[in-house]
UniProtKB/Swiss-Prot annotation:
Its main location: cytoplasm. The keyword RNA-binding applies. It comes from Corynebacterium efficiens (strain DSM 44549 / YS-314 / AJ 12310 / JCM 11189 / NBRC 100395). SUPFAM superfamilies: Peptidyl-tRNA hydrolase-like. PROSITE patterns: PEPT_TRNA_HYDROL_1, PEPT_TRNA_HYDROL_2. This is Peptidyl-tRNA hydrolase. Monomer. The lineage of its organism: Bacteria, Bacillati, Actinomycetota, Actinomycetes, Mycobacteriales. GO terms for molecular function: peptidyl-tRNA hydrolase activity; tRNA binding.
Length: 177
């Protein structure tokens, strides 16, 4: 790892309307990561994010909507002088079964508008992505509707475990940089 910190960003939508929705699993994961380190988020006005600073690590939640996440992520990279190679974005993934997590560097956005925005703003797809599986919508439900719905009662019981597993993977990954 170089001298710049690692930036871990959880994607989600701001506001109480979106708490507990599938699209906000990125927020759940970074909240777990920050909470287990006894830290708190505070507003970082220059980037329109909430951040928590840990040793060698900045954890962030954009305060913009998911599809506009790239702008605040780029602002954090510029402010803290972080290269895209030291960025890890946590996002929901329809193409992974519920509860599965997958870490990859580079690659496509899989149709995820938050990742599209991030890639556009960073000028590269060569950053780390942690996909957290939310599964496919049932029947003919529109995926855009599905991701904005709350987790089912049964799924809600698994979300804290899922967030903890993803946070474990982030911590393990950071140790290897």
């Amino acid at each position: 790892m170089n001298d710049s910190p690692v930036l871990v960003v959880g994607l989600g939508n701001p506001g109480p309307k979106y708490v507990g929705t599938r699209h906000n699993i990125g927020f759940e994961v970074v909240e777990e990561l920050v909470g287990r380190n006894y830290a708190n988020f505070s507003v970082h006005k220059r980037s329109n994010t909430e951040i928590a600073q840990l040793p060698g690590l900045i954890v962030a939640k954009p305060r913009s909507f998911m599809n506009l996440s790239g702008t605040p992520i780029r602002a954090l990279c510029d402010f803290f002088k972080i290269s895209p190679a030291n960025v890890l974005v946590v996002h929901d993934e329809l193409d992974l079964d519920f509860g599965q997590v997958k870490l990859r560097q580079g690659g496509g956005d899989h149709g995820h508008n938050g990742l599209k925005s991030t890639s556009r703003s960073l000028g590269t797809k060569d950053y780390w992505k942690l996909s957290v599986g939310i599964g496919r919508p049932p029947g003919r439900m529109d995926p855009a509707t599905f991701v904005l719905k709350p987790f089912s009662k049964q799924e809600q019981d698994s979300v804290p475990i899922m967030a903890a597993d993803a946070a474990d993977l982030i911590e393990e990954h950071i140790r290897t940089l």
